[in-house]
């Protein structure tokens, strides 16, 4: 694909995303305004929530970059960040595969081999889901399943994470059947997969910290605990992510989050609705602004060719 054609595709994606998100923001802002609540959010806690999300992005970007390097490729962190944020806009196009596909194409254009470009994107997507489940279930098991099940559940999920290097090829074949294309993952050092799992797990915890800062800022008081906040956010995010028909998980994530807020003692009624709607606006803005900024501020550059790392 020529440079001009690729830029056209990118800007077409931007237009679709902005139109979709703008409509959702307008609708949800109206719903927020109609709530029978007086909200005076803490600016410092809101800033802390944004900082925690950006920190989780930094961890995820480093994790993906590390996976690319494990394939014997080279990719600078700045290039990895640009690819990550711009391709993230594809989450707001129905089908979810746009994000993984865009990440692979952009990495290849940055000089990464096609196998490593697509393979690393798929690895991170799969490992991120496994790590998210491994974070959400133990944290929520105490209240959802009973404290006696926390240790067995945590042990089982830990084994699943350790088995990730062997589970990935199976998951890739399943993804291939879903996408109707050959999705084979070449051999990857087990250590690289485990590092990816740890990185994704840390990112989920940072997401939980960010979400807790947000709902404490909105309510003006601390409710629930950090474990419940992390479990509620992670579980609802994964439900939205796995709903292929929902762009950005919008609608599905909110449907899942509401009951979890009440279950973990965070909020109920109008306050739960406030957190659900505000968190969608908060997350949408944080997800799309960096990608748009990278597109607008990107300086023309030549395509580089990767060489195996020493």
Named regions from a protein language model:
Residues 97-110, 245-263:
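Re-entrant/interfacial helical elements at transmembrane boundaries that shape
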Residues 65-68, 104-105, 118:
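Juxtamembrane transmembrane-helix termini in multi-pass membrane transport proteins
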Residues 88-97, 125-133:
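Mid-bilayer segments of alpha-helical transmembrane spans in multi-pass integral membrane proteins
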Residues 86-93, 234-254:
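Transmembrane alpha-helix interface/packing and boundary motifs in multi-pass membrane proteins
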Residues 77-82, 99-100, 108-125, 267-278:
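Membrane-interface alpha-helices at helix entry/exit sites of multi-pass transporters
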């Amino acid at each position: 694909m020529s440079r001009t054609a690729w830029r056209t595709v990118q800007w077409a994606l931007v237009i679709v995303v902005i139109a979709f998100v703008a409509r959702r923001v307008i609708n949800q802002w109206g719903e927020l305004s109609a709530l029978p609540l007086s909200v005076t959010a803490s600016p410092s806690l809101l800033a802390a929530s944004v900082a925690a999300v950006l920190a989780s992005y930094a961890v995820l970007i480093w994790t993906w970059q590390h996976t690319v390097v494990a394939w014997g490729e080279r990719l600078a962190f700045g290039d990895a960040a640009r690819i990550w944020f711009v391709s993230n806009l594809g989450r707001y196009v129905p089908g979810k595969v746009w994000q993984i596909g865009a990440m692979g194409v952009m990495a290849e254009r940055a000089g990464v081999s096609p196998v490593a470009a697509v393979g690393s994107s798929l690895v991170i997507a799969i490992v991120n889901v496994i790590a998210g489940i491994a974070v959400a279930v133990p944290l929520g098991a105490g209240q959802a399943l009973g404290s006696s099940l926390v240790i067995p559940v945590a042990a089982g999920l830990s084994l699943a994470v350790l088995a990730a290097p062997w589970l990935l090829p199976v998951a890739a074949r399943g993804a291939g059947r879903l996408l109707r294309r050959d999705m084979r993952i070449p051999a990857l050092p087990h250590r690289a997969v485990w590092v990816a799992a740890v990185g994704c797990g840390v990112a989920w915890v940072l997401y939980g910290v960010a979400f807790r800062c947000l709902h404490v800022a909105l309510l003006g008081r601390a409710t629930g605990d950090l474990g419940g906040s992390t479990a509620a956010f992670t579980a609802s995010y994964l439900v939205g992510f796995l709903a292929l028909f929902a762009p950005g998980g919008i609608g599905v994530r909110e449907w899942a989050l509401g009951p979890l807020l009440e279950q973990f003692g965070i909020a109920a009624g109008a306050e739960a609705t406030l957190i659900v709607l505000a968190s969608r606006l908060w997350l949408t803005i944080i997800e799309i602004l960096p990608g748009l900024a990278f597109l607008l501020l990107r300086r023309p550059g030549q395509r580089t060719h990767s060489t195996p790392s020493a």
